[in-house]
Regions:
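Helical scaffold of the NTase/Pol beta-like nucleotidyltransferase catalytic core
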Residues: 1-112, 145, 151-157, 161
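Mature, function-bearing regions of proteins
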Residues: 62-64, 68-70, 181-196
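Short, conserved charged micro-motifs
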Residues: 139-147
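Conserved catalytic core of two-metal-ion nucleotidyltransferases
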Residues: 153-185, 189
């Protein structure tokens, strides 16, 4: 099994791993066998930071999971296909797929779309956004980012793309903008950088 990365969905979190003050809704989610999502946070060796997702946006619980407890892993890249759907977010996924495929970079849906495609549990609604991750191991020019954003903004709903660099993640919308520095999210926290691919700058 590959090493879990942010946005991957994991199955196998035992109830015994949850803290004593875990809310009832989170206990029910874990007990029902639903997956947890990998978070971007530092952990001790042998552990991964995960989040439990509830029915509403305010139902989110951060915790940790032993790597040895992972029974199954689904990455966003494995969730790219979807059948015709009345939900704007899934329609946006279908329209964005050929555009992103031409980039030559690995990508996939995260958030509610990824969760629904992975579990079959209906969590989307008419106002749902489409969250995507785009793996960018090498620098993407701001001009290219803006070109891609202009195309994606024609979709049936808002699309938010996270560019995953070797140092962390930055929003495509922010990287396509005019600000000299952008917010880079890493396991050690968030910081403003001028180049999200510059490891030395990100570690400074």
């Amino acid at each position: 099994m590959s090493t879990p990365r942010p946005h991957d969905l994991l199955w196998g979190l035992p109830l015994s791993a949850l803290p004593d003050d875990t809310p009832q809704w989170a206990l029910q989610v874990v007990a029902s066998g639903q997956p947890v999502v990998v978070r971007r946070a530092a952990c001790a060796d042998g552990w991964v930071a995960v989040g439990v997702r509830g029915q509403s946006r305010d139902q989110r619980l951060g915790t940790q999971m032993r790597l040895g407890d992972i029974q199954r892993l689904r990455s966003p890249e494995a969730l790219r296909g979807c059948a015709p759907s009345p939900w704007p977010a899934l329609q946006a996924l279908a329209s964005a797929a050929p555009v992103l495929d031409t980039c030559g970079l690995a990508w996939g849906p995260t958030g509610g779309v990824g969760y629904q495609l992975a579990t079959g549990i209906n969590v989307l609604h008419l106002a749902s956004d489409l969250d995507l991750v785009l793996r960018a191991p090498h620098p993407l020019t701001r001009a290219k980012a803006l070109e891609l954003l202009d195309i994606l903004d024609c979709a049936p709903c808002r699309i938010d793309v996270q560019l995953e660099t070797p140092a962390g993640a930055v929003a495509l919308r922010e990287w396509a903008g005019c600000a000299q520095r952008v917010l880079l999210k890493s396991p050690l926290g968030a910081r403003l950088v001028s180049d999200p691919w510059a490891a030395l700058e990100c570690a400074a």
